[in-house]
Amino acid sequence: MPQPCRRASRVLVTAVAVLSLAPTPVAAQAESSADFVPVTDAMLQDPAPADWLMWRRTLDSWGYSPLDQIDQENVGKLRMVWSRALGRGNQQGTPLAYDGVLYMPNPGDVIQAIDAVTGDLKWEHRRDLPDDLGDYLGGLVTTKRNIAIYANLILDTTGDDYVQALDVATGDVVWETQILDYTVNPALQTAGPIVAGGKVISGRSCRANATADACVITAHDARTGAEIWRRRTIPAPGEPGDETWGGVPFEERKHVGTWMVPSYDPALNLIYMGTSVTSPAPKFMLGGADKAHLYHNSTLALDADTGEISWYYQHLNDHWDLDHPFERLLVDTAVSPDPAAVSWINPRLRPGEVRKVMTGIPGKTGLVYTLDRETG
């Protein structure tokens, strides 16, 4: 049931306005679910300028807003209109904005719907989490970076290793599906999902006290919660990549997580996710320093319909816990790097040719990589 906001929190969500501008308030959310316009795949692929429908706003993970009402000339005139306390815990959440409502993930699996104009709370959902979660998952279990919206649902991954859907009008649970048993194979779900072609795509940080079966990327039907596929990031004996582990027993292969939010190219129907390190990180403690131990510290391009790995690119064979899970930026651009500015250029590259690329700083090394997102 909805409960009052915890006012004791030190964290605030704020709204600001430019005092000298004519007021152009965002329309308030419709009073009934019958008036709500469901969010479609087309809207996710090309959101209206005022909408922020996912963590980085668009499926290509740009994090860019085309709105231009606030500019260099008037930004100094911004003033607070309202503020609202958020829940206690490790706050890394980004709100969604749609139809005059902010949908805000709070620490500890609390989601709020807030009127964007007034700051009034429309509803709040608090998941009833087990008391022993911290024993299995540690202190980061309260962290939540993002949620997703699709149709008339708010979609989320939970601290107790479920994926759930809430009614956008009420916050009531519509469906929930268990992904893992946290007492057997604990995984931190600090990043929420995206929706790609009606499928809820989510990754997680599998713990060192779990098996390789916790290191999975999953897809669920957004409307029903039925699992469609799951993809391990650590190969089992006999699977492609098994030979890169140097004979390490499967039960000792651990910790290749996908703990940030994926990107998606609907034209190629490929999902792009980055992976973390092994546990332990130094490879001489596993199969040998010369072994790749796939698919750690890699970019994975997955078929959105099947979860099959279309291609992978390993950024480095890591020994120092330098994860590479961060957002992958999808860009169509004329690739023409300055040879003096980069350490390596593909000799097959034709300067000035427009390519579909994946770029950005995917890992903790701070290096920029640019890959062909069709082939890797």
Question: Which residue stretches match the model-derived regions?
Answer:
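Repeat-blade elements of multi-bladed beta-propeller folds
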Residues: 52-56, 88-110, 136-163, 188-211, ...
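N-terminal secretory signal peptides that target proteins for export/translocation
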Residues: 1-8
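Active-site-flanking structural segment that lines cofactor/substrate pockets
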Residues: 70-99
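Blade/loop signatures of beta-propeller domains
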Residues: 30-80, 233-240
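Bacterial N-terminal signal peptides
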Residues: 11-23
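Signal peptide processing junction and immediate N-terminal pro/mature segment
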Residues: 23-31
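Extracytoplasmic/lumenal domain signature
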Residues: 73-84, 111-138, 150, 154, ...
